[in-house]
Amino acid sequence: MRINKPFSDDSNTVVFVSSKTYGVKEEAAHNPNVEFGVVLPTDFPAFNRALVQFLKRKKTKLNINLDSLIELYKKNENSGCFHTAIKTVITSVTFCETTPFTMKTKPEKNVEVAVQCAVEYHNLVKEYETVGEYVNLARELQDTPSDLLYSEVFVKHFEKAASKLPVKIKVLKQSDLIKKKMGLLLGVNQGSEREARLLVISYQANKNSKEKLAFVGKGITYDSGGMNIKTGDYMRGMKYDMSGAAIVCSTVLALAKNKVKTNVVAVAALTENLPGAKAQRPDDIKIAYNGKSVEIDNTDAEGRLVLADAITYAAKDLAATHIIDVATLTGLMSYILSTTYTGIFSTCDHQWESFKKAACSAGEPVWRLPMHPDYLKPLQLTKLADLQNSTSARGAGSSRAACFLAEFREGVSLIHCDIASTASIENLGQGVLVRTLYERASQLANK
């Protein structure tokens, strides 16, 4: 993306014009004042979707007059929203300018954008261009085939990406996980020839704050279902089961690159879930890192197992004061919220309100779903362990999974983000929630 270096006069220019709502129009010598569409002034998720759809149709050079958008907001009663509008435009542009991963011999051409804006907004533009770059990093890893991306490769990718940033990286290898007695993560890993990993990326930039936000990501680099193997269409796209890990790690690097004064750590639980000769089976009982025993009812409910140990690690070993996990956890989300909203579960109303504000500022639609002790009861019916990892009981499967995770938070507030229906759309990774997590961590910097 170019800043204040417009393309030639023959290029289209996008300006934002005022009406009862906001319109986006193109202006070019050969095609003047052609209206593209309208976007409600404060509906930033809709604004984001409209801009992305518009930019993806463009395969040419395009100038965007950001000053026209700023003036539009300043003249309106929603003048306080123009910073969010700028963020939305910049992250939409970086999303559309790049194809993060492709193995095509002739890659498709993307739009090239030059942004025109006043000097006083350059820092804001550059900040969110960086956020967009790390959204694209998450997308790149999401789209990479699982034969090229497994736990060891995932770790190396982030070690390289973080090499010049003020972060600390710690990698718990298989032997470390055994010493720690992370039985749930190790149990899922039993069927794979490749070892599990727990990747920890720490960024501490606010010594005056006692708050530490932990982002925990599910990193199943391929999910076959294990011994409860998936069939047909249910296995297609399971390379995206590591999306949560890619998203949380990318977010921490974005915060570090922009030197946001906050304390945050990413924890990525990495393994494959395969039906090898040594794979765990239904009826096995595993001991979690927090000491609880878990009976395996279904090996395809593996995400909550690896997350459970990672959440406990964030609470006990890293002294997190707030935990947010991101995971492609339950396929039911596609029926509940489709690809429009990400489902959010929270043990704390106050933390939910802060998260909702962050999502609004990021222009990402989220919807809170319920947690209730009744949802956990079917998982407590086992006579042989403290919990089962799943049940044949009908209804509220996504809420039940969230309640299972809450059993491992060690008293720390937990927000669970189920991105099963929003992580990838039309077989392309979206880097969903990188922007929201960035905004949430930035909120703590402003306290």
UniProtKB/Swiss-Prot annotation:
Q: What family classification does the UniProt entry report for this protein? A: Belongs to the peptidase M17 family.
- Biological role: Presumably involved in the processing and regular turnover of intracellular proteins. Catalyzes the removal of unsubstituted N-terminal amino acids from various peptides.
Q: Which organism is it from?
A: Mycoplasma genitalium (strain ATCC 33530 / DSM 19775 / NCTC 10195 / G37)
SUPFAM superfamilies named in the record: Zn-dependent exopeptidases (SSF53187)
**Keyword DNA repair assigned:** no
Q: What is its main location?
A: cytoplasm
What is the protein's given name?
Probable cytosol aminopeptidase
Disulfide bonding pattern of the chain: none
Where, per UniProt, does this protein localize? Answer: Cytoplasm
Question: Which Gene Ontology MF annotations are present?
Answer: manganese ion binding; metalloaminopeptidase activity; peptidase activity
Q: Where does Mn(2+) 2 bind?
A: 218, 223, 241, 302
Q: Which residues participate directly in catalysis?
A: 230, 304
